[in-house]
């Protein structure tokens, strides 16, 4: 009788050990916490408190590495309203369709960014586009993403003028224009380096 009890308890113990081991293995295979995971294509997820981004990548449906940028503001209908840059432009590079900021790889999962002001254009991103980023000391709260084909990057920087809506209601002009000036673009192993940003047009 005692032997049967011992065998019974040993069997129960082994079953529990196997069950716990299986659970541990399953949990290690689960994706990262919800704040860093997007679901199905087109689904919108919150990536920071009060801020969300739309996921639209058919190849990857699991973990998304968060960018090293501060994101502030509120979100409405799945749109990011304000992005605050905390890295310099020279710390950014683009290689094989992936944007890298300060050494962290950001997969092109964010396909739509919209600012709080209605005048800001909704900028669609995908892996086939080059993502340019710029910031301004005059507008420290602005981190504008601009897209364009890789081969047209230098031409765009030299010839295009990008517009921002007015940042203060008291301003007479509807928009403050940003002009690229003295921008040196070089490509090394697929990485794009920017020596200078742009200046505000007079």
What spans do the regions from the language model cover?
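Bacterial N-terminal signal peptides that target proteins for export
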Residues: 2-10
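C-terminal motif of bacterial Sec signal peptides marking the signal peptidase cleavage site
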Residues: 20-22
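Short, aromatic- and cysteine-enriched interfacial helices/patches
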Residues: 24-25, 198
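Low-complexity, intrinsically disordered terminal/linker segments enriched in charged
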Residues: 123-202
